[in-house]
Amino acid sequence: MQDDLKNAPIGFFDSGLGGLSVLRKALEMMPNENYIYYGDSKHAPYGEKTPQEIRSLSFNAIEFLIKKGAKAIVIACNTATSAAAHDLREYYKDIPIIGIEPALKPAIKLHETGSVIVMATKATLTQEKFKNLMDKYGEHREVIPLPCPGLVEFIEAGDLEGEDVKNFLREKLNPYMDREISSIVLGCTHYPFVKDVIQDLVGEKVDIIDGSSGTIRELKRRLEENNMESESKKKGNLDIFNSLEDKKILELSKKLIEIK
């Protein structure tokens, strides 16, 4: 039975395609594990929904992954982590559930001066979880919350470097370009897919970071702690599902997994 558990897949879910940026890090750090990814593109973006709606959709996603045999679950969505992680852990006490949050602490530690911009959904920036992060680390540096409604939709449509998304990001970031910006935190798992565009706009001196590595390190730690890590020496399997059940969205998912 323990061997079955070790070989069981790790479930990832997100409001759409963004969580693939976190899954990509897992494939890099733990290639021998099996994975299931569930993207809820039918209901994307979560960032414009109420906390109650986000919780309901998150419970549906976890039920899907558990029925597929997931041994652990990664909430690869900042918005869902903020709104639902506590309730999910309370309900599913027997399964490790790992969330993701804006990487504000490492962003502040990187530099002794300069402001930090946190790009995220409105829902993430207004939740208690982010307010707690601000209380903990915001006093050490100017932290600029920057809601980006509309950016998720570009990525869901596969527009990662077109003129429209470049203009959108330029309009968002231009008001801050006369300040000393030390780093930008990508507080939505969709946003790493447009990291190169952001870097071009702000310049190479600005560090751009996200929470993927920290989340996967925590996943690894929890699996080891519970003696659940795979002992296979072979590359694991990956199954991708999406609530849209659209062939194009699955093709785009596979393409995004391969982008470095």
From Swiss-Prot:
Q: Which UniProt keywords apply?
A: Cell shape, Cell wall biogenesis/degradation, Isomerase, Peptidoglycan synthesis
User: Which residues bind substrate per the record?
Assistant: D14, S15, Y46, G47, N78, T79, T189, H190
* Coiled-coil residues: none
The annotated pathway is: Cell wall biogenesis; peptidoglycan biosynthesis
Q: Which PROSITE patterns match?
A: ASP_GLU_RACEMASE_1, ASP_GLU_RACEMASE_2
The protein's superkingdom reads Bacteria
Which InterPro entries does the annotation name?
A: Asp/Glu/hydantoin_racemase, Asp/Glu_race, Asp/Glu_racemase_AS_1, Asp/Glu_racemase_AS_2, Glu_race
Q: Which GO terms describe its molecular function?
A: glutamate racemase activity
Catalytic residues of the enzyme: C77, C188
Quickly give the catalysed reaction. Answer: L-glutamate = D-glutamate
Q: Give the Enzyme Commission number.
A: 5.1.1.3
Q: Give the UniProt record's GO annotations in the biological process aspect.
A: cell wall organization; peptidoglycan biosynthetic process; regulation of cell shape
The Swiss-Prot or TrEMBL record describes its family as follows:
Belongs to the aspartate/glutamate racemases family.
Which purpose does this protein serve, as stated in its record? Provides the (R)-glutamate required for cell wall biosynthesis.
The name this protein goes by in its record: Glutamate racemase
